[in-house]
Amino acid sequence: MEETQRSAEYIFQGIMYYFRREKVCPRYQFTLKDPVDPALLQRALDAALQAAPYFKVRMVWEKQDAFLEPNPEPCLVYRGSTQPQMPEQTNGYFFAVSCEESTVYFDWFHFLMDGHGVSPFLTRILELYCNLRYGTAFADPPLPSSPAYDIAALVERYPLQLMDETTLQREVVQTCESTMHRARVRLTKQSLVRKGVENGAKPFTALMGLLCIALGEYLGKDAIQYSYSGDTRDAMGVPDASYNCVCSFQDGVALHEGIRLEEFVGPMDAAVRESLTPERKRRKMADQMGWVYKVDQQKAP
């Protein structure tokens, strides 16, 4: 992005996160073998930003329109483990790098980026820090960043159902407050692989099935709904997208007392596999993003 360039093309992909009542701000943290040198970490951050201009942006508003433009403010390394408010306390940046003793913290606002998109950038910061601190030789080429996908073309290819007051009203999942109880369940990767192989299913499906059984027993329910997300970069033709590029699916399973995983994991696994085909993922993206596109089309000039 050039210094004078202003763009709105990446806003759509994460705008639903921007207007949520509660911000989604994930955190990655890494414990190093030695105390972190903040000055070297700052140098690594500065160098990584030069290789990844997508992250060196701020958002500006003009009336009802939001744009991204290059951020001229310094991107600072913060001291301590407290997560700063992004972008209010981070000079307009939508991520933050902090350190305390031997731990490095990476915080990011789930608006311009998702976990898949931000990980190469955060990895680059660590690599450059290791180059400076320990004399390693990690390369520092520009980080690729795919252009925004064409939402208009996506919606045209997968037309949305007519949205009115009736179709927009959905049943709200009822919640209640009660005393929290915690239970720790230890599942190893090997045990999930074994369960999946035994039942001809993905380890992920085996995990979801076991969790559904446990939740059904814990909550005293005979049906459990579950959700999962799939990365859509390859399906959308944007393999190096830094922005949000996931779709979410929901399904459910009927339970009964004493039910075993092998009784239902087959159909569950088939549904998961079918939902993660490129065509299904593109259609789901159109369903998720279509309303954002339609609302934007209706705003006053």
Sequence positions of predicted segments:
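Short, well-ordered alpha-helical segments in soluble proteins
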Residues: I125, Y129-R133, L215, V272, ...
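Beta-strand elements within well-structured catalytic alpha/beta cores of enzymes
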Residues: V104-W108, S227
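Acyl activation and transfer enzymes in specialized metabolism, enriched
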Residues: K33-A52, D107-T123, R184-K221
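Non-catalytic, low-complexity flexible loops and terminal extensions
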Residues: E2-I11, L112-K195
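A short acidic-Thr-Gly-centered motif at the start of a beta-strand
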Residues: F95-E100, D164-T166
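Short, solvent-exposed beta-strand edge segments and adjacent coil->beta transition regions
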Residues: C25-R27, E101-T103, M180
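Acyl-thioester-dependent acyl-group transfer interface
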Residues: M1-K63, E73-A96, G216-P301
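Hydrophobic residues embedded in beta-strands of well-ordered beta-sheets
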Residues: Q64-A66, V104
